[in-house]
Amino acid sequence: MSTVYYPSVILKKSPLPLKLTPARASGNFGTPITAALQRASFNITIITRTESSSTFPAGLPIIRTSYTLENLTTALAGQDAAICVVGPGGIGAQVLMIEAAEAAGVKRFIVDDFGWGPGFRNLPEFRAIHAHRRAGWELAKAKAQANPNFTFTGITSGNPIDWAMKRFPLMGFDIARCSAIIYDSGTEKFTATTLAGIGQSVVGVLQHPDETANRFVKVLSIITNQNELLEAFQRVTGRQWPVQRASAQTLIESGQQKFQAGMGGWVLELVVAQMYDEGEARCVMAPSWEASDSPLLGVKKESADEVVAKVLQL
C-alpha cells in the first residue's frame, strides 16, 4: 500500500511489494507522481486536510482529516510507504508526517525534495527555507538509524524543466511570445527533470527499495544550457526567436534588494539567477545521465527537442 500526502495520497493494496502514501497528489508534482503510480498499478488513497478544496483524480479513495499526530498515524496505519510532496507552503508539516509514518509502521518515507538536495550551494537568502526542509530530512535519517523497520529516500531532481519553462518566462523563454532572455553567454549547464521523469523516479524508488534506502537519489532527464534550449525552440517552432540579453548578477542584485526590503518576487529571481550564475555549476546534480540514478529508476534521457516539445504541449 502507499500513501501520498496531497497534502496526501495513500496507495493501498498494491500488487507490487510496497503500499504507498503520497502527500499532495493534486499539486504541481503530486499530479504527475500520482499518475505514474497509477500507471504502475499501485492502488492509491489520498489523505488531505478536512478543509482542502483540492480536486483529485476520479475513483481514488480520499481520507479527509486534520493534521495531528494521532489522526495521521491512524490514516497511515497499514501503509508500506508515504510520499511527501507538500511543497514550500506545507513543508513545516513534514516533521509531523514523518513522526506519524514511523508510529504507523510505514516502511519507506519519501521526503519532500524534488529539487536540489541537501548538498546544494544555494544563495544565503534561501537558508531559512532550506532549514525547514533539512529538519524533515534529518528527522527521517535519525528515525531510520534508530528503527531498522523504517527507511527513507530523498529524490533530487533539479529543475522541473517543462513545468518551469512554461510557467516562468523569467527562466529565459516566453512561450506565448516566442521570445527569449539569454543570461550572460547562455552556456551555463544545469540538470533538469521533466514532470514525467519526476513521476517515474518515485515509481523507480518504490520498485528498488534496497538500492534506494536511506539516501538521496539523483535523477535527471537532461543536462543542458540556455543556448541549446533556444536552438531547440527555434527548430521545433520553425521560427527565429528574438533574444534579449541579461545578466545573472543583475538578477541576483535585484532579488537580494527585494529580499532585504521584504518585497515579493525575490524567490523566483534568485532561483533563476543561481541556475544561470556563470561558472558556478551550482545546478548540476550529476555529471551525466549515466552517472545519475536515472538508469536504475527508469527515468528516460531526453533531448532538448523532446523537452521543448513537452513545454509547448503543456
Swiss-Prot record:
SS bond list: none
Pathway(s) the chain acts in: Secondary metabolite biosynthesis
Induction: Expression is positively regulated by the oxaleimides biosynthesis cluster-specific transcription factor poxB.
Claim: Oxidoreductase is one of the keywords in the record: yes
UniProt KW keywords: NADP, Oxidoreductase
Coiled-coil spans in chain: none
Top-level taxon: Eukaryota
Keyword Oxidoreductase: yes
Pfam families referenced in this protein's UniProt entry, alphabetically: NAD_binding_10 (PF13460)
Protein EC: 1.3.1.-
Annotated Gene3D superfamilies: NAD(P)-binding Rossmann-like Domain, UDP-galactose 4-epimerase, domain 1
Enzyme superclass (EC): oxidoreductase
Bilayer-spanning residue ranges: none
Molecular function in Gene Ontology: oxidoreductase activity
Role of this protein: Oxidoreductase; part of the gene cluster that mediates the biosynthesis of oxaleimides, cytotoxic compounds containing an unusual disubstituted succinimide moiety. The first step of the pathway is provided by the HR-PKS poxF that serves in a new mode of collaborative biosynthesis with the PKS-NRPS poxE, by providing the olefin containing amino acid substrate via the synthesis of an ACP-bound dec-4-enoate.
Family: Belongs to the NmrA-type oxidoreductase family. Isoflavone reductase subfamily.
Protein name per UniProt: Oxidoreductase poxI
